[in-house]
Amino acid sequence: MAELSEQVQNLSINDNNENGYVPPHLRGKPRSARNNSSNYNNNNGGYNGGRGGGSFFSNNRRGGYGNGGFFGGNNGGSRSNGRSGGRWIDGKHVPAPRNEKAEIAIFGVPEDPNFQSSGINFDNYDDIPVDASGKDVPEPITEFTSPPLDGLLLENIKLARFTKPTPVQKYSVPIVANGRDLMACAQTGSGKTGGFLFPVLSESFKTGPSPQPESQGSFYQRKAYPTAVIMAPTRELATQIFDEAKKFTYRSWVKACVVYGGSPIGNQLREIERGCDLLVATPGRLNDLLERGKISLANVKYLVLDEADRMLDMGFEPQIRHIVEDCDMTPVGERQTLMFSATFPADIQHLARDFLSDYIFLSVGRVGSTSENITQKVLYVENQDKKSALLDLLSASTDGLTLIFVETKRMADQLTDFLIMQNFRATAIHGDRTQSERERALAAFRSGAATLLVATAVAARGLDIPNVTHVINYDLPSDVDDYVHRIGRTGRAGNTGLATAFFNSENSNIVKGLHEILTEANQEVPSFLKDAMMSAPGSRSNSRRGGFGRNNNRDYRKAGGASAGGWGSSRSRDNSFRGGSGWGSDSKSSGWGNSGGSNNSSWW
C-alpha cells in the first residue's frame, strides 16, 4: 500500500428453495433426511459480458446456503429455524447440532479473503475516542464474553473470526442488554452492522419469540410476526446485512429474511410465509408487504434504522413514519429502537425524538469525517485527460480491488467498456442494471473475478466489500458527505486503503469541504486546492446538511437552547465531544424529495 501511494504521489499528471411450506400439524416434527442440492452456485462465465451484465458467475441469494438450504419454518407449540436450525421449546433455546458443510458455506475458510473480518490496524481502534451521553450509561465491554452475550452467539462470532469488539460494539452490547434505546454515530467501517446484530440476536436467543395472536382462519393468512425489523436504504445494503445475519443466526431459532424492491415479490413472500423472525427490509418494499397483510409488526421487540440519514435524504421519511407510527408496530417505550449511521446532524437527531425513548447517544471516532487508515490523494486532472490518468493509476496498482466512482450511468457504461478494451477485468453497477445484474457484478467484484468496479452512487453507502484497497473518484461528487462515504469503501475494519480523486475547475463547489476533510485527517493538501479554496466564494463547506459544521457528532440535548436537564451522567473515553456551536431550528424538514412508490428503485 505504501508503494502504491508513493507511485500515485509521483505520477506525472496534474428461487430454488427446497424447503417448502410446513403445515401447522407437522411443525416441530422430525423431517425425513434429504440431500441439500442447492450449494453455492459458482459458475464463472468469463469476462465477455462487457459492462458487468450476465457473464459473471451467478450469486443467487435465494439458493445456495441461504434461507432454503438451512433455514425455514415456524413451529406450532415451539419455534424452529428449519432442518438445521435451532428451536425454542418450553422457554428454552435448543441450538441445532453443528453442520460442517453449512459452516464452510456460511463462514468460509480462514484463508478466504471474501470472509475477511479484521485488518492489520485493528488494534488501533482501542485509541479511537468514544463518548456516550444519556442517563446511566452502562460500562462498555472489552471482549466478547458470556455474559452479557449469549453462548451460541459467541460461538458464531468465533466462527466468523471476530476476535475483539469494535468501539461501537463495546457500547451497543451493554446498552441493548440494559433495555435502552440507542443512537449510534460511528465512522464508516467501524463495525456498525455487528453493533446492532450482536446485541439484538443475543437478547433474542435469551428471551425467545413473543406469542403470536390467536389464529383467525386456517392459516391466518400465513402472516409473519418478526421479532426484529432492520430497515436500510438500498437493496444492496439490505442484502449485505442479511448475509451477516445468516452467520450469526446459525443453529438458532431465529430465521432471517430480506425483502427489497426491484425483485419479484412472489419469491420474497414465499420466504416470509415459511417463517420470519428477523426481517431486513427497504422501506418501500416493507410498506408494500404491510399493505398486503403479509407482515405484522405487533411482536417487534427491536427496530433498527441503518444509514438513517441516507434514508431520509432519499425521501423515505413518509414511508418510515407510516411504518413506525401508523401500522401495528409496538409503540415507543415497549420496543427498543436503534439508529445507526456514519453521520447524524442535528435535524436527524431531532427527528429521532419521535422514534426513541430515553436513549443513549453514542459518538465513536471522527464521525462525519474520514478514517485515518485511508491515504487520500487529490490530483488535478482535466476532463479530457481523465482516462489517461486512470490508466496510469491502474498500472501502478497490482493487488486488491479498485472501486471507481462516476457521476452518471452513461459514464459508468462508457468507462467500463473502455477498461475492458484495455484488458482490465471490469464490471459496472448502476441504477439501470437489473437486480440480478447488480448482484452478479457485486459477486464478481467480491470474488476477484473482476478487479475493477465502476459505480454510481448506488454503491456509495454501507456496502462492505473486503479487499477494496483503492477508491478512485473519477468524478467528484458535489456534496462532501458523499465524498466521505465513497472513500469509506476502503480502509474498513482496520485495514489501510488509498483514495484518489480527480479534481479540476468544475469541482469548485466541493473545494472547502474537501480541504477541511484532508486537513482533519492529516492528509497532504495540494497547492492547487489551497489556491482554489482561497478564491472560492463563501466560507461554508458544501454539505446537504450544511450550517452545522462538519463534525455533527454531539448529542443535540447538550446544545444551547435544548433541554438537557435530567439526562444524568455522560461517560467519555479518551476525548470529549466536538461540534458546531449552533444546531439551527427544531423544525421538520420538508425537502427530503419524492417518497412516491414502494419499488424503492427509481432514485438511482
UniProtKB/Swiss-Prot annotation:
Q: Which species is this UniProt entry from?
A: Saccharomyces cerevisiae (strain ATCC 204508 / S288c) (Baker's yeast)
Q: Name one GO cellular component term.
A: cytoplasmic stress granule
The name under which this protein is listed is: ATP-dependent RNA helicase DED1
Instruction: Give the taxonomic lineage as stored in the record.
Output: Eukaryota, Fungi, Dikarya, Ascomycota, Saccharomycotina
Gly residues composition-biased segments: 46-55, 67-76
Q: Which family does it belong to?
A: Belongs to the DEAD box helicase family. DDX3/DED1 subfamily.
- Binding of ATP, residues: 186-193
Keyword Nucleotide-binding applies? yes
GO biological process per UniProt? positive regulation of formation of translation preinitiation complex; spliceosomal complex disassembly; translational initiation
Helicase C-terminal domain spans which residues?
373-533
**Entry's EC annotation:** 3.6.4.13
Compartments, as annotated in UniProt: Cytoplasm
Which residue ranges does the record assign to the Helicase ATP-binding domain? 173-362
Q: Where is the composition biased (Low complexity)?
A: 34-45, 584-604
Q: Where is this cross-link: Glycyl lysine isopeptide (Lys-Gly) (interchain with G-Cter in ubiquitin)?
A: 158
Query: What Gene3D superfamilies does the annotation carry?
Result: P-loop containing nucleotide triphosphate hydrolases (3.40.50.300)
Task: Please give the PROSITE patterns that the UniProt record associates with this protein.
Answer: DEAD_ATP_HELICASE, HELICASE_ATP_BIND_1, HELICASE_CTER, Q_MOTIF
Which Gene Ontology molecular-function terms are recorded?
Answer: ATP binding; ATP hydrolysis activity; eukaryotic initiation factor 4G binding; G-quadruplex DNA binding; G-quadruplex RNA binding; mRNA binding; RNA helicase activity; RNA strand annealing activity
